[in-house]
């Protein structure tokens, strides 16, 4: 195959599209701005906000752990029940949230453009005879 003499210039990369972890982090921190929340409350908040689309429980737990390890949230147990863990946002979490609040609107717009283009591309194959 001959080398492309006129390559298309890449103006952006997929790394600049919204990532699932950023959506979860944003939703968790925004919810915690209203006060402490339990793991299950935040999970329900996300599912409700996205009209029934939720987060895999193990992935959600890993994101909460990552936010804790980064110092963006604190976590405590309510009594002896290890499942009654509640979280609070920290000053570092507020700064991270402010950063995301500045960056996310453009990332979401970019993601919409990418997904619209991908949707159009997929439609081409729906019209093909793939026998």
Segments from the language model and where they lie:
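Intrinsically disordered, low-complexity serine/threonine- and proline-rich regulatory segments
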Residues: 1-22, 83, 101-107
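Short capping segments at the starts of secondary-structure elements
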Residues: 21, 31-41
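DNA-recognition alpha helix
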Residues: 40-52
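Basic amphipathic alpha-helical segments that dock to polyanions
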Residues: 60-67
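Beta-hairpin "wing" of winged helix-turn-helix
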Residues: 70-88
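Basic, amphipathic "hinge/linker" alpha-helix immediately C-terminal to the N-terminal HTH DNA-binding motif
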Residues: 82-101
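Amphipathic alpha-helical dimerization/coiled-coil segments
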Residues: 98-131
């Amino acid at each position: 195959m001959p080398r492309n003499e006129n390559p298309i210039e890449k103006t952006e990369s997929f790394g600049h599209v919204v990532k699932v972890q950023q959506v979860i982090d944003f939703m968790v921190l925004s919810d915690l701005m209203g006060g402490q929340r339990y793991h299950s409350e935040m999970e329900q908040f996300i599912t409700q906000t996205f009209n029934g689309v939720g987060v895999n429980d193990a992935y959600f737990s890993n994101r909460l752990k990552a936010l804790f390890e980064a110092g963006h949230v604190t976590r405590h147990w309510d009594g002896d029940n290890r499942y009654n863990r509640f979280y609070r946002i920290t000053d570092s979490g507020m700064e991270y949230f402010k950063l995301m609040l500045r960056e996310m609107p453009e990332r979401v717009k970019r993601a919409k453009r990418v997904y619209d283009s991908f949707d159009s591309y997929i439609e081409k194959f729906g019209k093909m005879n793939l026998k």
